[in-house]
């Protein structure tokens, strides 16, 4: 949506804004069902010499905060991690919008990162773990450009907070695909 998290939260009283790095809204329906609502993201950056408090990065390039909002699905799709996570559904028209080849990758069992892998992994090193988790869970292969930088850039994971790493590692093993996750982790 092009609505900000704060606007979504005002519309749905049964919601809460979560995340510091990437704000999203969890809307609770029927007691337990959670719908995750995200605002379109933008690739725009602060002008040279200007401070942009909505996008902050470390010296390594890791995004510490990225709440620069966009206005279009196309722009937002370029900020997603993998092509299969950049598919958009219009529930009224019952149409899927795909700007990055995600349908092809889904049909062919491929996990492919969007954009330059080195840049994208530097922005958020957890993307490396997410790639491995999706591969283990879905039985998909990592594209060469997605897998090749993982060993080389794995030290970037040391910059991720302990709490966030704990959360991501737990996800590797609670999806019912723990053995596959273990095998793929050993590979990398």
Language-model features, listed with the residues they occupy:
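Catalytic cores of the polymerase beta-like nucleotidyltransferase superfamily
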Residues: 1-188
């Amino acid at each position: 949506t092009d609505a900000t998290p704060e606007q979504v939260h005002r519309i749905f009283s049964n919601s809460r804004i979560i995340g510091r790095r990437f704000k999203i809204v969890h809307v609770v329906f029927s007691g337990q069902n959670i719908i995750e609502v995200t605002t379109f993201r933008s690739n725009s950056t602060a002008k040279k010499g200007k401070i942009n408090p909505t996008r902050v990065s470390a010296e390594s390039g890791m995004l510490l905060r990225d709440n620069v909002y966009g206005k279009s699905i196309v722009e937002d799709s370029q900020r997603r991690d993998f092509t299969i996570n950049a598919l958009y559904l219009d529930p009224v028209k019952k149409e899927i919008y795909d700007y990055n080849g995600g349908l092809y990758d889904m049909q062919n069992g491929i996990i492919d990162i969007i954009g330059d892998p080195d840049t994208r992994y530097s922005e958020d090193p957890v993307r490396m773990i997410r790639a491995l988790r999706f591969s283990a869970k879905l039985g998909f292969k990592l594209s060469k450009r997605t897998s090749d930088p993982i060993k080389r850039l794995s030290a970037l994971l040391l910059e991720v907070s302990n709490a966030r790493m704990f959360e991501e590692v737990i996800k590797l093993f609670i999806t019912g695909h723990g053995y596959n996750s273990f095998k793929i982790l050993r590979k990398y």
